[in-house]
Amino acid sequence: MNNNIAISKENTIKLSFPLVFDTKTTNTSTKEYVETIKEDEKVDLFDPTIDTKLFVKPDRKTKKNDKSDQRDSDIDIIKTKLKSKKKEKSKFRKDEDYDSLKREDNQSPQGAMSSLPFARPEVPAKKMVSNTNTLNKKNVVKSSTKKSKKQTSAKNRELEQNLLVKPENVVIAGPLSVQELAVLLTVSETEIIRSLFLKGIGVTINQILDVSTAKTVGEDLGINIDHVKDSDEESKKLQIHEIDNESLEKRPPVIAIMGHVDHGKTTLLDKIRKTQIAQKEAGGITQKIGAYEVEIDYKDQTKKLTFLDTPGHEAFSGMRSRGVQVTDIAILVVAADDGVKPQTVEAIKYIQAANVPIIVAINKIDKENADIENIKQQLTQYNLIPENWGGDTLMVPISAMKGTNMENLLEMIILVSEIEDLKANTKVKAQGTVLEAHLDRTKGAVATLLVQNGTLRIGDILTAGTSMAKIRGMINSLGEKIEECLPSSPVLIWGLSKLPASGEHFEIFDDEKQAKIAVQKAQEANKENQTIANTISENYTLSNSNTKGVINLIIKTDIQGSAEAIIGSINKIPQDKVQVRVLYASAGEITETDIDFADTSGAIVLAFNTSLATGASKAARHLNVKVKEYDVIYDLLDYIELTIEEITGPEYDKKSLGKAIVQGVFPLAKSFVAGLRVTEGKITKNAHIEVIRQDLVVFDGSITSLKKVKEDIGEAIEDSECGLFVEEFDTWQENDIVQAFELIPKKRKEK
């Protein structure tokens, strides 16, 4: 074979070795084509003087192979470097303390809380306050998305839970999920879900809980949960008090009357206003915030005062809290014949937390068993020390019923208001707070507002949370229609798109476009912080073996504050056998829609200080829907408790009969019998027993049979021995304690 292969410079052919030639002549064979090449165009590929690269075009595969070889070379270099680094890291050098190490030091008990000598230290949680657990919502949301690849077994999780210690106080920044709350409270998610389930709230592990719901869970578990609000929210609320100093004018004081139920708050206000409000109130108790303006003569001048009469009943804590937040002076009413009570203490805490000046009115001094000095002594426990005892708290003994010392009390109020130097700017747009809201048959959604700065006028475009209004009308506390409202004055307005939430701040905008933007922002914020307690839960599938039934409720009230109070009171009913589920609670009259939904869901409709709309009463009778109407919150709560008792059956008081100790365990067929020695009292065959092991009740039930040798006996007395068989329990152990009781049925309340 001739080594000299001739090719054309224009056309190339593919050789047996990896060279690719581009050829135009596709139908001509290689041999024929080579013979047609002119002599001067032939090239000797094996001639060392010829640069064959000028004529050769590399194949694409060749290019890829070259690049692959280059990458392989680079990878080999990198691997070599990594190996050298690993070798350097793996070197172990003994130091002078090496010989003192012991194998036992590196062994630890199983569990996440065990101390591992070489474990990475835990990163401390952010925003910790003293010894309390704190949760920053943003941080937790991020961290909660990281899932561990290894799933902990149920046994290990239980061990972890036992090792954790529940905190006494926890601080949260806002709404959070069930899972996040469980981490903070060091409890299982199941425990939180069960607690809410029994209150009628079905949740999942990732569902968001609002602050009030989280606090309710904390109360059930004996953990105090504090809410630290974001700085942005706080600064927004403080904008109300940012006033142009050059345009300031004196304004009337806002005075909140607070104290325990039946201590005479409304009677005191009646005496000041010279009215008879107390006689008109259902059950003799205030059940909503009453806002009133009063003009009194003082030193040849007419002074205007604004009073807020807050409810004293336990259920209305939310209203009391709102009342003190907008007040300038607080009057704490304490009955001289009754003393300091739970709601008195709660009111003191609200007042002191708001840093509001306080005047104590010791009422009912005309009663025979009145003890003014004892009241003063009780109040010193809460850092309220009278001036004549060396303190700085103003205390005025009065009789609201007879009008004793009323002038002294009013003089003190005016004196304190002058010291406080209360001012506002009437030339700016109005700002203030929503005290209450309800639905009116003719006006629609109406709200009672307290103007705190600026001037409110008919036609103003107002927003309060997600509610918006072009004010169509205003009525003052005397029931008179007015065109404008000045600072420190309460006013009833209508023209609202929907009911605003009580306690919401309101502000005025120049046009509807700006107002709609503000409402849209509030709606977006509400989507994130939406409370699950006010929505119908679809999570009805959670089962609990201890739950004996479900009560579905639809609650309609006169105002939103009453609905809030009723829901809060229902959640505090001490029971864990029945799930009380509030499907929804709202202000307004009962409609046919409410009746239809109650029929579908099997709910009881509770009406509080409201009535049935036209057609609703007929629909309720036709569909056999139970509707209960109340005007006193005590009666409404009593009805719910009685309904719970009907489901759970009779409740019993336990009367101790005797105690015995297990001295031996004997087999009987497929079960076991406990051999007892009675140490106290007696054990009767009909007794209810508890089996106690290491201070824990391992069985609670009744006796199947009681024997002495082989004979049935009715009872075994102290220092005697007997055999005890319980069909439902056979895991006896020596030294178990058997406590016997007689069950005495509790008396039922009458409906």
From Swiss-Prot:
Keyword set includes Plastid: yes
Region: Disordered, residue numbers: 86-156
Renumbered residue ranges of the record's region G1: 259-266
Domain of life: Eukaryota
Biased composition (Low complexity): 129-143
GO-annotated cellular components: chloroplast; cytosol
Any Pfam family: GTP_EFTU
Boundaries of every tr-type G domain copy: 250-423
Gene3D superfamilies: P-loop containing nucleotide triphosphate hydrolases (3.40.50.300), Translation factors (2.40.30.10), Translation initiation factor IF- 2, domain 3 (3.40.50.10050)
Biased composition (Basic and acidic residues): 93-106
Entries under InterPro entries matching the protein: EF-G-like_DII, IF2_II, IF2_N, P-loop_NTPase, Small_GTP-bd, T_Tr_GTP-bd_dom, TF_IF2_bacterial-like, TIF_IF2
Residues the record lists as binding GTP: 259-266, 309-313, 363-366
Record-level Gene Ontology MF annotations: GTP binding; GTPase activity; translation initiation factor activity
Record keywords, A-Z: Chloroplast, GTP-binding, Initiation factor, Nucleotide-binding, Plastid, Protein biosynthesis
Region (G3) location: 309-312
Intracellular or extracellular location(s): Plastid, Chloroplast
Segments for region (G2): 284-288
Region (G5) residue spans: 399-401
Stretches for region G4: 363-366
Task of the protein: One of the essential components for the initiation of protein synthesis. Protects formylmethionyl-tRNA from spontaneous hydrolysis and promotes its binding to the 30S ribosomal subunits. Also involved in the hydrolysis of GTP during the formation of the 70S ribosomal complex.
Family the UniProt entry places it in: Belongs to the TRAFAC class translation factor GTPase superfamily. Classic translation factor GTPase family. IF-2 subfamily.
Protein name per UniProt: Translation initiation factor IF-2, chloroplastic
